[in-house]
Amino acid sequence: MKGFYMYYLGIILASVVGYFLGSISWSIIIVKKVGNIDIRTIGSGNPGATNTVRALGKKWGLVVAFLDALKVIFTSIIAILLSLIPSSLFSQTSYFIPCIFALIGHCFPIYYKFKGGKAVSCFLGLLFVVNILYLIIFLIVWFISVAISRKVSVASIFSAFFVLIIMWIPYLNGVSYFIWQWNGLEQFSVAWKNYILFSLLNSFHYWFSNIWASGMLEGNIIVLIGGLILGLRHSQNIKRIKNKTEPDTFPRKKQAIKN
């Protein structure tokens, strides 16, 4: 039992804090403050960035998306601070694992009877923490998809699925070959130097201790879990997409009929 706490106490503490941090619903707070509206009673009823756009416009939707992504990033920063504590209880605190609990908190917030958002903005924060290249690819695919489909749900689901596929491709994930080890810095020093160029926050492990960092496999598994949660949270959207009843988030402008 002592050995368990020796390696995982920092992860447990950061994960608990991350869950409570993730449970903060910025869409509920901001829409109520700015528009005096309960976002859960309008539009899709979902407390997220897209429904905030419906309630307050694109500007506030972007604000909510940014703040939701920050919940995951701040959770990683908390893990970083814990890892700096000069004790074996905290020195190997993962920066990735606690982030998934922030995403779970967003979807199932304790402050709002476990009824939360659909994880897209938090997934963006997760991609930023794990691998900045994943985030860039997601955003490129998302903007193209939303321009074609006019549906945020379609763009979000497709972009997440696309990232879940390409993240296993060498070089796109920052390494030249697959690294399976969690604590593999010594054995793969050259590959790690390439990997942490894309995993910015993970680089702190290397800079501060020079002996340990979260592995590529760990990061990809966390992204996979986040992507699956995102997909499950969009299950109703997927049904409507199949039935061709999913409404456009950004309807196309109707062309005037010339006589």
UniProtKB/Swiss-Prot annotation:
**Enzyme class, broadest EC rank:** transferase
* Catalytic reactions of this protein: an acyl phosphate + sn-glycerol 3-phosphate = a 1-acyl-sn-glycero-3-phosphate + phosphate
Q: Which GO terms describe its biological process?
A: phospholipid biosynthetic process
What is one GO cellular-component annotation here?
plasma membrane
Question: Which family does the record claim for this protein?
Answer: Belongs to the PlsY family.
Gene behind this protein: plsY
Question: Which Pfam families would you find in this protein's record?
Answer: G3P_acyltransf
Return the InterPro entries for the record: G3P_acylTferase_PlsY
Function statement:
Catalyzes the transfer of an acyl group from acyl-phosphate (acyl-PO(4)) to glycerol-3-phosphate (G3P) to form lysophosphatidic acid (LPA). This enzyme utilizes acyl-phosphate as fatty acyl donor, but not acyl-CoA or acyl-ACP.
Q: What is this protein called?
A: Glycerol-3-phosphate acyltransferase
Share what the entry says about its subunit structure, partners included. Answer: Probably interacts with PlsX.
Membrane topology is: Multi-pass membrane protein
List localization entries: Cell membrane
EC number(s) on file = 2.3.1.275
Keyword Protein biosynthesis attributed? no
